[in-house]
């Protein structure tokens, strides 16, 4: 499971070269290195599950989160391409794209901001880490053996 992540909200014109590189390194390069390390073992046993964690912003883009959105979109591209490449080896590759999940990444949000985000979500609540984990457990299991190259949104209907 490739789940490293950082977040930063700022205007695109204020993003430094270092911040851009760090965002891509953590989200995209981290997943690349993780997959590259795990794949030989999976290919050898002709079975494996690779799961990446992107974001709804990787699907639709987020204002003031251009670097984050670009890194997460790259992760979706990595997932889809790797699924096609490794399918013949018995390895599935899928992605979970969480929406607004109540994690440490939201620590700087006020209670009012969190309430407003919950209200925008069709299911009327913020997601939980357990809900994201449940989606990952499903995709890692035998029941998902014919699912590959997919992006599963865990976002309460915010992105459809």
Segments the model singles out, each with a brief description of its role:
Residues 35, 71, 79:
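Active-site helix of classical SDR
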Residues 11-12, 19-24, 106, 113, ...:
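Substrate-binding pocket helix/loop in short-chain dehydrogenase/reductase
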Residues 55:
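Residue(s) in the substrate-gating loop at a strand-loop-helix junction
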Residues 40, 84-88, 145:
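Alpha-helical segment proximal to the catalytic Tyr-Lys
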């Amino acid at each position: 499971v490739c789940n490293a992540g950082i977040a930063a909200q700022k205007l695109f014109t204020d993003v430094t070269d270092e911040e851009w590189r760090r965002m891509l390194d953590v989200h995209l390069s981290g997943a690349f290195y993780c997959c590259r390390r795990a794949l030989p073992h999976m290919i050898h046993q002709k079975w494996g599950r690779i799961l990446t964690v992107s974001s709804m912003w990787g699907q639709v883009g987020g204002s003031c989160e251009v670097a984050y959105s670009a890194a997460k979109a790259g992760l979706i591209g990595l997932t889809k391409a790797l699924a096609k490449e490794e399918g013949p080896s018995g390895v599935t590759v899928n992605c979970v794209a969480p929406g607004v999940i109540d994690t440490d990444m939201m620590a700087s949000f006020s209670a009012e901001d969190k309430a407003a985000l919950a209200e925008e979500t069709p299911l009327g609540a913020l997601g939980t880490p357990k809900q994201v984990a449940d989606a990952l457990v499903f995709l890692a299991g035998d029941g998902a053996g014919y699912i590959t190259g997919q992006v599963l949104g865990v976002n309460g209907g915010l992105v459809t």
